[in-house]
Amino acid sequence: MSVRLFSYLRSQLTLLGVLVIGILWASCDAGITGDYIENQAPSTYMTIAGIDREDEFRLSSQIRISWWGNDPDGYVAGFEYAINDTSEGAWSFTTRTDSTFILPITEGQTVDDVLFKVRAIDNDGAKDPVGARLRYPIINSTPSAAFKPTETPADTMFGIASFGWTIDDPDGLLNVRSTQIAFNDTLNGWVDIPFNATNNGELFISVSVDNKTVGIKTGQVYLGRSYSSAIDGEGNPILVSGIEVGATNTAYVRTIDAAGAVSMRDQVQWYVKQQKSKVLFLNDIGKNSSLDDMNWHLSYLSELGIDPDIWLINTGQPALGTIELSDQFPKVVNPTLKKTLAQWDHIYWVSDDVDRNIVHALDITSEFFAGGGSMFVTIPMKEVSQEDVIFNFLPVDSIGFFPPGGIETGFVINAGTEITPLDDPNAPTLKLESRVVGWYPLQAVSGSTLLYESDYRSTTLLGFITDYTIMEGVSIKNTEGEPHRCEQL
């Protein structure tokens, strides 16, 4: 029974195999029948069907446009769009269905009707032969340019001046074609300044001229706080002409948009002072006798053959602490003030209070000292905390003090007392012509040199005067490394 069943099953499987082979053979022999369907092109649609606006109700040239597409036998792989020019080479590809565009206005016109056309592309590369189109009625807005008051020159500057300004366009910063600056000449003096639309419309440049002689000069432009040389599209340095040394100058800025609309001009004036010396005299004496005291110092410098450039920085008075940096300095410290002070080899700084501009000296003179400059500071000391910022700059370790619980009230040097040199045997011995009250003795910081000392005395609550011996320094020279600073008090 089992043998007969096995034989039967084998015969059936053989027959099934023959039938399958026959069917496959017949299929290959017969081929596929039916009608071939061609790929159908996609269709494209604008989200907005039409726009009806005239006159002042026209749209800004910066517009967000959206569209969509459909493909009956596949899917939309992307789109191509064109603005005004719809010739075959003018289309741009995108996979987006919306974007923000700056629609171009014909140069010289204030209004225009701009054509925007878009067409879908399907997965087989077929393009919508018709596409979708819409004309946008737009009106151009005038751009603007304005100086930033905190980034313009002080009333009087030497050879370096900085200018910061902002530009804007209601149609978007991408619609700005250029921003320009001119000096004293608004007909032929305009110079393009490079800008990036990503900097929120803020620009900052510095202009340096050779101010060793008076007259009209050409200046070089530097960009940003990094003070990097500005170059044009051909790699040449950007120069500006018309700046006059020894005269009041006017700087102008303006902005031009893609349609050629020009902003109103903004302007700022400043005086460019000639630099005649390698020595700069900084007058930071805030009291009424400022000019008389300055002339006293200048007379002694003149005896040494020194005729310095003079910079008055004595505006403002300390109140509840240190004074703000003088408004007679540039408003921008870095790079303007630092670069300016570095133009001299030596600085002679006179002040009547350690809470005046000298507290800013460590910051503003960094490039001056980095270039090998030296400084002489004469300033009366007073009782200040050892944590005061002045000790970060002056080569002073400490100033005169009285032990707690004592009866001493102040310092005095009597008339006729000698001020004797310590470091240089050829230095003259000085003598006070009158009694001096309020001079504080000094202790030199490590690495500096005590130049002069004197016999300080102490006044007391009981009315008598005693000798003061803790320290007796009058002036100190800092010679530790480069640069060095020199101070007399």
PLM segments and residue spans:
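Surface-exposed, short loops/turns at beta-strand junctions within beta-sandwich domains
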Residues: 104-113, 240-248
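Short beta-strand segments within Ig-like beta-sandwich modules, predominantly Fibronectin type-III
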Residues: 90-99, 192-198, 227-234
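Conserved structural position at the C-terminal beta-strand
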Residues: 69, 120-122, 255
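Helical hinge/lid and interdomain linker segments adjacent to catalytic or ligand-binding clefts
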Residues: 289-392
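Bacterial Sec-dependent N-terminal signal peptides
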Residues: 21-55, 126
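Extracellular fibronectin type III
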Residues: 123-141, 258-272
